[in-house]
UniProtKB/Swiss-Prot annotation:
Part of the 50S ribosomal subunit. It comes from Pelodictyon phaeoclathratiforme (strain DSM 5477 / BU-1). One of its GO terms (cellular component) is cytosolic large ribosomal subunit. HAMAP family: Ribosomal_uL13. GO terms for biological process: negative regulation of translation; translation. This protein is one of the early assembly proteins of the 50S ribosomal subunit, although it is not seen to bind rRNA by itself. It is important during the early stages of 50S assembly. This is Large ribosomal subunit protein uL13. PANTHER family: LARGE RIBOSOMAL SUBUNIT PROTEIN UL13M, RIBOSOMAL PROTEIN L13. The gene is rplM. Transmembrane segments: none annotated. It comes from the Bacteria. Keywords: Ribonucleoprotein, Ribosomal protein.
Length: 149
């Protein structure tokens, strides 16, 4: 006799989640398209046991952040705005300057904008590791290369 069909909704438990490590080479990749794929894997939406309120995602290591591609005139025109809530506390970072000083920050900002802005989102964001060059210290985790279209 076969098993009976069950119509119960599956909810993943944190202890049951199997986490993998992936490495993404950002060289020549379009920033937004790459960031959306990374956010999907960090969130765990690529897994059949995805549960919205549980961290079911995997770890992502991004290398060559300094060689990420920006379409259009974004390299000259795009900027990130922040304010310290004090008078005169406006801080504007231009992408052109960030590519020279902190290229990791560009990918981090793009991915953070695609994650939920709550406690779960901060937990997911901690699983993203971004490096400007091609070297990373996570070889012992044996990350699998992930292709991004």
């Amino acid at each position: 006799m076969s098993k009976t069909l069950s119509f119960k909704t599956y909810s993943a438990k944190p202890a049951e989640v199997d986490r993998k490590w992936y490495v993404v080479d950002a060289e020549g990749q379009v920033l937004g398209r790459m960031a959306s794929e990374i956010a999907k894997v960090l969130r765990g939406k690529h897994k059949p046991q995805f549960t919205p309120h549980i961290d079911t995602g995997d770890f992502i290591v991004v290398t060559n952040a300094e060689k990420v591609a920006l379409t259009g005139k974004k390299e000259e025109q795009k900027s990130y705005f922040s304010h310290s809530q004090y008078p005169g506390g406006v801080k504007i970072d231009h992408v052109k300057d960030l590519l020279k000083k902190r290229p990791e920050r560009i990918i981090e900002n793009a991915v953070w904008g695609m994650l939920p802005h709550n406690n779960l989102g901060r937990q997911l964001f901690r699983k993203l590791k971004v490096y400007a060059g091609s070297e990373h210290p996570h070889a012992s985790q044996a990350p699998v290369e992930m292709k991004v279209n």
